[in-house]
Amino acid sequence: MAGRSAARRPRGDREPLGPRLRAPRPAREPRQSESRAERGLPPSQRSSVRSAASGHDRSTRGAPAGACKPRVKKKVRPRSSQSEKVGSSSRELTRSKKVTRSKNVTGTQVEEVTKIEEATQTEEVTVAEEVTQTDNMAKTEEMVQTEEMETPRLSVIVTHSNERYDLLVTPQQGNSEPVVQDLAQLVEEATGVPLPFQKLIFKGKSLKEMETPLSALGMQNGCRVMLIGEKSNPEEEVELKKLKDLEVSAEKIANHLQELNKELSGIQQGFLAKELQAEALCKLDRKVKATIEQFMKILEEIDTMVLPEQFKDSRLKRKNLVKKVQVFLAECDTVEQYICQETERLQSTNLALAE
């Protein structure tokens, strides 16, 4: 240090220096040290110096000539086989745990996806059903509307005495347009005048042909039709009441006949002791014959009734009542025949036992 300080020149005696130059770094050598041929080559093709200690090639770029020694890799001791086994086993355990977790996660995801799919399918089915119901309802409404639009209707004003009825005539099944029969039935419902006693007049003409279309008669919406006829005939009402009473009596006798038929079924099935069957069959036969006589009396009363031709309702009711009583008489004959068969079977059995 003393020598250096003594060798220094005084500040004023120093020679003027030029611009300060930066000294080159000790670890690198200037770019001019590399040859132009090497500079132009890619790094992979440049010349390298193999380190004597490490045995690896090191690039000579940036290394000063004979300045520093190249770095030497430390020798690493080889791992023991036991540590390698422990490491491999721990890795396998970790991998198995990860796989198990991933499987669990995958299973949970699959369940969630399944639930979502089921919920989606249920919602789709519900929406489809609602859409189907809505479509069906819409179609039904459209069909009803189209039927109403397609069905020809006719509004008619019917006058009866001092009363007025606004009627809407529609055709019955099988008819494409309303006919006189449809109008007459509607008038009967509205006024109470029976159809046989109606006289419908339109433009001075009586409507007698029941199958004639109203359009063929020149009827249009708002046309007027006059009704002539009484709501009820007192004389016919008396005859209808008689027929009604006879019908009620016939139904009561028919109910009694059903009870006799049940008694016969009990005897046939053996619900009664054999010693009492013969006597029970005789009593049952007498009851059936009495029932037949009651039905015959009703027929006689019906035959004695005299009904004029204009009493069409009474005559029709009498005809139906006669048919009903004849059906009851046929049932009586069937029961009586069964009683005779059962009596003969019982007698043959008793004879066989006596022999």
UniProtKB/Swiss-Prot annotation:
UniProt xrefs under SUPFAM superfamilies: BAG domain (SSF63491), Ubiquitin-like (SSF54236)
InterPro entries: BAG_chaperone_regulator (IPR039773), BAG_dom_sf (IPR036533), BAG_domain (IPR003103), Ubiquitin-like_dom (IPR000626), Ubiquitin-like_domsf (IPR029071)
Gene3D superfamilies associated with the record: BAG domain, Phosphatidylinositol 3-kinase Catalytic Subunit, Chain A, domain 1
GO biological process, one term: positive regulation of transcription by RNA polymerase II
Post-translational modification: Ubiquitinated; mediated by SIAH1 or SIAH2 and leading to its subsequent proteasomal degradation.
Family annotation (PROSITE patterns): BAG, UBIQUITIN_2
Role summary: Co-chaperone for HSP70 and HSC70 chaperone proteins. Acts as a nucleotide-exchange factor (NEF) promoting the release of ADP from the HSP70 and HSC70 proteins thereby triggering client/substrate protein release. Nucleotide release is mediated via its binding to the nucleotide-binding domain (NBD) of HSPA8/HSC70 where as the substrate release is mediated via its binding to the substrate-binding domain (SBD) of HSPA8/HSC70. Inhibits the pro-apoptotic function of PPP1R15A, and has anti-apoptotic activity. Markedly increases the anti-cell death function of BCL2 induced by various stimuli.
Protein name: BAG family molecular chaperone regulator 1
Species name: Mus musculus (Mouse)
